[in-house]
């Protein structure tokens, strides 16, 4: 009963928030809102400089691998459990996934700076 009430409340609240966001009027975009602001002075140059897409992709790849490695941090504490085989299998699966992902990125030339 409590689970059903919680799910119903969450669904209704999410639906209400979506409806409010949908029915709110769109804000007007003025030229002042789209121009860059530098401490009250006119900007010295363009604030919208292009960035390297390769750098962005390498940075996203680094973040993904970093998050996956963070999953390995509790392994020393997990080794004290009674079910050691399951812990070792899960660690091996995670490390294998990391190795396969790295090999795939390498073969797709996702880690190279030159195009």
From Swiss-Prot:
Which cellular component terms (GO) are annotated to the entry? mitochondrial inner membrane; respiratory chain complex I
Indicate where this protein resides in the cell: Mitochondrion inner membrane
Q: Which UniProt keywords apply?
A: Electron transport, Membrane, Mitochondrion, Mitochondrion inner membrane, NAD, Respiratory chain, Translocase, Transmembrane, Transmembrane helix, Transport, Ubiquinone
Q: What is its EC number?
A: 7.1.1.2
- UniProt keyword annotation of Electron transport present: yes
List the membrane topology term(s).
Answer: Multi-pass membrane protein
Pfam families reported for this sequence:
Oxidored_q4 (PF00507)
Tell me what reaction this enzyme catalyses: a ubiquinone + NADH + 5 H(+)(in) = a ubiquinol + NAD(+) + 4 H(+)(out)
Q: Name the enzyme's class.
A: translocase
Example GO molecular function: NADH dehydrogenase (ubiquinone) activity
Membrane spanning stretches: 3-23, 55-75, 84-104
User: What's a single GO BP term from this record?
Assistant: mitochondrial electron transport, NADH to ubiquinone
Q: What does this protein do?
A: Core subunit of the mitochondrial membrane respiratory chain NADH dehydrogenase (Complex I) which catalyzes electron transfer from NADH through the respiratory chain, using ubiquinone as an electron acceptor. Essential for the catalytic activity of complex I.
Q: Assembly state and interactors? A: Core subunit of respiratory chain NADH dehydrogenase (Complex I) which is composed of 45 different subunits. Interacts with TMEM186. Interacts with TMEM242.
Say which family it is in: Belongs to the complex I subunit 3 family.
The protein here is known as NADH-ubiquinone oxidoreductase chain 3
Q: Which organism is it from?
A: Equus caballus
Q: Which gene encodes it?
A: MT-ND3
């Amino acid at each position: 009963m409590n689970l059903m009430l919680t799910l119903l409340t969450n669904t209704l609240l999410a639906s209400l928030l979506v409806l409010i966001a949908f029915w709110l009027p769109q804000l007007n975009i003025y030229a002042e809102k789209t121009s860059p602001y530098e401490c009250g002075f006119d900007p010295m140059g363009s604030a919208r400089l292009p960035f390297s897409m390769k750098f962005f992709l390498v940075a996203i790849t680094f973040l993904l691998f970093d998050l996956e490695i963070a999953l390995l941090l509790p392994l020393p504490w997990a080794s004290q459990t009674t079910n050691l085989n399951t812990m070792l299998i899960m660690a091996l699966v995670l490390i294998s996934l990391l190795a396969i992902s790295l090999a795939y990125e390498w073969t797709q030339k996702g880690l190279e700076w030159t195009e």
